[in-house]
Structure formats: C-alpha cells, structure tokens
Amino acid sequence: MKSTCLVTGGSGFVGRRLIQILLSHGWQVRALARSESAVRAVRGHGAEPVRGSLDDVASLEVAARDCDVVFHVAAYFKLWGDPAEFERSNVQGTANLLRAAAGASVKRFVQLGAAAVVMGDRAPMLGVNEALPLQERAWAPYSSSKARSEAMVLGANRPGIFETVVVRPPMIWGPNMPTLDHLVEVVKAGQLRWVDGGSQAMSTAHVDNVCNALELAVEKGRGGEAYFVSDGADSTLKEVLSGLLQTRGIEPPRTSAPLSVAWVMACAMEWIWRVFSRQGEPPMTRQMLRLIGAPFTLDIGKAQRELGYRPVVSRQQGLELMQAT
C-alpha cells in the first residue's frame, strides 16, 4: 500500500484523472472539495472528499493532516481577467496550502506548474530547458501568477523535511479536456483563423503523461527543482488543433493571419474590453497569442534523466482514444 495523499483540483480535468491513476497504483487519496458538487465529483472518482478552500487555511490544515504527499493541481486559468483574482487563487492560495502542508508534516509537495512560466514576448522558443529564468508579463496574468507561485513553492523546499517539486507541462490535452468544446464552438462560428498558417512548432502533454510525471516527481524528483515534461514528439499548432477537432468530426479552418497583424488586433481588443468594461473574454488576447502564436518546444531531458520519465501515451494513441469515447 502506498502513502496517503491530498489532491487539490480533483474535480477538474487533470485532477480527476490523477485521482484515478493514483488509486489504481495503491494510493490512499483525499481530495479537497470547495462545493457540494465538487464533493460528489471527487467521491465519484473514488477519492475521499474533504470540504475546504485554498482561501481557508484552517480547512487546509484539516485536509493535509496525516498526509505524506500533497499534489497541488488546482489553478485559476483564463486568458483574460482581473490580475487580483489570479493573485488570490494561484499565488495566495498556494501560499496557504504550503503553510498548511508544512504544518501537517507533509513530506512532499508536488505542484502542477506550467511551461508558460518561461515565455517572454513573441520570439520563437525552441528546445527550452529549465535553465531559463521565470518571466512575468503584465499582459499575461495567468503565466505571471504561475511563475510567482512556482518560485514560492521551490523556495519552500527543506531537504529531508519538506521537499517541493514542480512539474511544468505545455498544453495539456486528452479525453474531456475543457477547452475543446469552446474550440469547436469557435470553429463552427467561423471565428478561428490560423496564426502564420499554424506552422509553428509546439510541444503538448497528454493528461496521462502529466499524471505519470506528477507521480514520478514524488518518487524521484529532487527537492527544489522544476521539470519540463511533454509527449516527447513535437507537432505544429495546425496538426495539434486539427487532430483534436477531427475527434469531433469538425473540419479545421482554412484561413490565416500573420502573427504581427494578430498581435495588433489583440492589443486593440484588450483596450476595448478594458476601457468599456466589456463582459467575458476578448476573442483574442496577447496571452492567447503567446501561448499558441509563436514556436515553443521543450527539452525534457532533465525529466528523463532524473525522474525516469517516458511518455505513456503517444499523440496517435491519445487521439484514437478520444475518437472512441
């Protein structure tokens, strides 16, 4: 029997799959649940639900009690929004969980990070490794908040006492991915154009590969370290999105716009939304374009050497599984 762990974000895309995989490997799994619907969801996945919130340190202390490991998967992810909300959820919420976990004598704290924490402006980034510094951009509140959160997590490492590790995937995909429904709607409405023809190289990470890396980080990760992980074989933006759309029987778009033009359009849309207090998200933002509009691939050599990481699901296998479900 493996250790007892706490999972945050257990009702979400990655969290629910992580719960299923951990249970199949013999873990005792608790899952933080901030609502009754979340309680039902994580219980349905097989975990023991614990009511609490990242805003409530007392509830986190109860949730982490007698746990050996914390998997911090929860995050506030949007491509547009109030920076204060990203700060509250992704930075202060993580600080609260770190405090509770350390106080409960948790041995390992593994955070699901984001490859985007090293993204700068629009320049291509190929074969990126962990030597690159964290980046913060005012127009990218999600990745900036994840960068601050990661720095805090790794800074909390105490060798042999409270060891912290961060796993950094690029775009996570797989069955029930929450962004695919929105992508289908946008394509059906004729609102999606490729940027620079969709030819930009990109790394991706199937949800099972991410969960595998999170578990390996507990067993083999060095405290105070971050690890890039991916599917191993890179693709282009057009190949990735076309493959996902085709699992729903949707033909990909054919039109394209240059990145330089799209960047100006995104700036204009952000200005309109900000000045006129428009509701919802702009159709295009600079953060969105940075995530998908320029080449970005990862060197996963460190994870391979130190964690023994190998992708467990290939791109083709993952697409076939999505097609079948």
PLM feature spans:
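Substrate-positioning beta->alpha
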Residues: R148-S149, P178-H182, D196-V218, G224-E225
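NAD(P)H-binding glycine-rich loop region in Rossmannoid oxidoreductase-like domains
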Residues: S37-R43, A47-Q92, A100
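Active-site Tyr-X1-5-Lys
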Residues: R137-V165
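Glycine-rich Rossmann NAD(P)(H)-binding loop
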Residues: T8, G174, D196-Q200, Y227-D234, ...
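Mid/C-terminal beta-alpha module of Rossmann-like enzyme folds, strongest
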Residues: L216-P282, I300, Q316-L321
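Amphipathic terminal alpha-helices
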Residues: L298-E306, R310-T325
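Conserved Rossmann-fold NAD(P)-dependent oxidoreductase catalytic core, especially the SDR/UDP-sugar
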Residues: Q92, N96-P141
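N-terminal Rossmann NAD(P)H-binding glycine-rich loop of SDR-like oxidoreductase domains
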Residues: C5-H25
